[in-house]
């Protein structure tokens, strides 16, 4: 089984979501399913079929979150050097062709969020940034095509999800 790095914040988020599904969402859905079952004819009972489908989806989510947790390796980015890009590093870079600046933080897959500038360590850009330092130029091959970036700064910034 391949291990997946994640921050403690990411791990806590996943375990909280799992806890909510197991202790709140699933029991409430089981009750709704039982109540719908008591309404009679199950063939034409929309409430029953809806609750049954919802329970199935919740069980799938629980299984997926359990799989994430079983593969998790918690890494504390504060213990890593950030003079070069590594897990948990925040990187300021500029597209040398357009002068557009970007800031990304490298995190675990379940923590990634494009809107927040948090990219998975497995993403094409993160893989190519690893080990680089401020001042380096990077010819990145990305799904949208090739881009050239200059790394302006590599540092640690507290990760908030």
From Swiss-Prot:
It holds the Pfam family GreA_GreB_N. It comes from the Bacteria. One of its GO terms (biological process) is regulation of DNA-templated transcription elongation. The keyword Ribonucleoprotein does not apply. InterPro entries: GreA/GreB_C_sf, Tscrpt_elong_fac_GreA, Tscrpt_elong_fac_GreA/B, Tscrpt_elong_fac_GreA/B_C, Tscrpt_elong_fac_GreA/B_fam, Tscrpt_elong_fac_GreA/B_N, Tscrpt_elong_fac_GreA/B_N_sf. Keywords: Coiled coil, DNA-binding, Transcription, Transcription regulation. One of its GO terms (molecular function) is DNA binding. Gene3D superfamilies: Transcription elongation factor, GreA/GreB, C-terminal domain, Transcription elongation factor, GreA/GreB, N-terminal domain. NCBIfam families: greA, PRK00226.1-2, PRK00226.1-4. Necessary for efficient RNA polymerase transcription elongation past template-encoded arresting sites. The arresting sites in DNA have the property of trapping a certain fraction of elongating RNA polymerases that pass through, resulting in locked ternary complexes. Cleavage of the nascent transcript by cleavage factors such as GreA or GreB allows the resumption of elongation from the new 3'terminus. GreA releases sequences of 2 to 3 nucleotides. Belongs to the GreA/GreB family. HAMAP family: GreA_GreB. This is Transcription elongation factor GreA.
């Amino acid at each position: 089984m391949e291990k997946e790095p994640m921050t403690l914040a990411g791990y806590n988020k996943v375990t909280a979501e799992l806890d909510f599904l197991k202790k709140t969402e699933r029991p409430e859905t089981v009750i709704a399913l039982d109540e719908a079952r008591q309404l009679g004819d199950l063939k034409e009972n929309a409430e029953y079929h809806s609750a049954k489908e919802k329970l199935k989806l919740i069980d799938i989510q629980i299984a997926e979150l359990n799989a994430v947790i079983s593969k998790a390796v918690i890494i504390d980015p504060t213990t890593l050097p950030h003079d070069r890009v590594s897990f948990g590093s925040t990187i300021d870079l500029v597209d040398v062709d357009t002068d557009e600046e970007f800031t990304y933080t490298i995190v675990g897959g379940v923590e990634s969020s494009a809107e927040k500038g948090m990219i998975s360590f497995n993403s094409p850009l993160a893989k190519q940034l690893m080990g680089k330092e401020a001042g380096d130029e990077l010819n990145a091959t990305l799904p949208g095509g090739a881009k050239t970036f200059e790394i302006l700064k590599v540092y640690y910034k507290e990760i908030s999800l």
